[in-house]
Amino acid sequence: MKAVIFVIDGLGDRPDEFGNTPLKEANTHTMDKIAKEGICGIMNAIDIGVRPGSDTAHLALLGYDPYETYTGRGPFEACGVGITVKPGDIAFRCNFSSVDKEFIVTDRRAGRIEDTSLLEKELDGLKIDDVEVIFKESGGYRAALLLRGPNLSDKISDADPKKEGKKVKEIIPLDDSKEAEKTANILNRLLKVAYEKLDGHPVNQKRRTNNLPVANMIIPRGVGKVPEIIPFDKKYGLKGACIAGTGLIKGIAKMVNLDVIEVKGATGTPDSNFMAKAKALVETLKTHDFVLINVKGADEAGHDGNYEVKKQVIEKIDEMLTYIMENIDRKDVYFVLTGDHSTPIEEMDHSADPLPIVIWGKSVRVDDVEKFDEFSTCKGGLNWIKGKNIMPILIDLMGLSKKYGA
């Protein structure tokens, strides 16, 4: 038997004045069919009342306790863009930004600069005292930064002022340790070096000539120490893979040793190539025991507060599922359909609202639920579960669980 966890990023919502959500209103023939043929429930990725990030939610869905394994977003971003991370490394997500001579931020995203590959080379490979700087752009104004060396700490503040017109924050230690003091000092020096190297760079000289915001500063945030995590294959004895369009989810997959399957046109946006992902899933099941697939467009629509686009994305995902269901057999595959968190239109951000979930496959206890949405699946046989329960349920269904007790 094989298993799939199909995650519709940002799936859940809150009812509007008419009691509808994008999922409830969408034409989801295949999702509803899966619900009718499976066992349904509702699920909080982390816990009841806890508003999940996509990173912590996916860790939980893979059976890892985020309270034990999550140190910050930085390590997963770094891993996702191809940096080889090691336990003890300190990692950050970064923006290329525009600042004046006083380090006042004039544009947090450097005019959404599209190509920073030449700027990356100015910073990658630097050494400050005994600390190596590993830096990689991750598309446009985004980048990842990793510090490698002895006696470093993640107990430091961010540099991000979060608003334009504010000065880049001095990084300070958050405890009294020498390690935190050293790390803050290294990072503050790095930001000064970055400004010196980037401000007069030919890329930025050309941008000034064209009256475009320069990318003359990096602003690190989301610090975390690279954690020690049991690889997925050792934890479960399954050869696993991940299909995702966003670097963060790819980073989580790489961190737990899932093979990342690259899909052309999979962008993580509402205009992503959804069907290419569906075909990739079917092909990947031929070579792997387990696949985590993340489809993100609904989340972006939720963050934008766009009800119609979120509904349309959900309908595109239903078309994906039609193809998938036509090409897998319930005798061979257990299929979990759910989300990682709700992104309500009214909030335009993640919320702690629970998500619909269904498990489809051989010998599941089919219940009376006939529609896949936030209001119907709560009547199903799974009742109310947490994300960390999904993998143990799958492992048991696959006949791989060990008995607890005599």
UniProtKB/Swiss-Prot annotation:
Matches recorded under SUPFAM superfamilies: Alkaline phosphatase-like (SSF53649)
GO annotation terms (biological process): glycolytic process
Pathway where it operates: Carbohydrate degradation; glycolysis; pyruvate from D-glyceraldehyde 3-phosphate: step 3/5
InterPro entries recorded: Alkaline_phosphatase_core_sf, ApgAM_prokaryotes, Metalloenzyme, Pglycerate_mutase_ApgM
One annotated GO molecular function: phosphoglycerate mutase activity
Disulfide bonds: none
UniProt keyword terms in alphabetical order: Glycolysis, Isomerase
Gene3D superfamilies: Alkaline Phosphatase, subunit A
Catalytic EC class: isomerase
Catalyzed chemical reaction(s): (2R)-2-phosphoglycerate = (2R)-3-phosphoglycerate
EC number in record: 5.4.2.12
PANTHER family: COFACTOR-INDEPENDENT PHOSPHOGLYCERATE MUTASE, METALLOENZYME DOMAIN-CONTAINING PROTEIN
Family designation: Belongs to the BPG-independent phosphoglycerate mutase family. A-PGAM subfamily.
Function: Catalyzes the interconversion of 2-phosphoglycerate and 3-phosphoglycerate.
Name of the featured protein: 2,3-bisphosphoglycerate-independent phosphoglycerate mutase
Naturally occurring in which organism (per UniProt): Methanococcus vannielii (strain ATCC 35089 / DSM 1224 / JCM 13029 / OCM 148 / SB)
Record lineage: Archaea, Methanobacteriati, Methanobacteriota, Methanomada group, Methanococci
Gene name as annotated: apgM
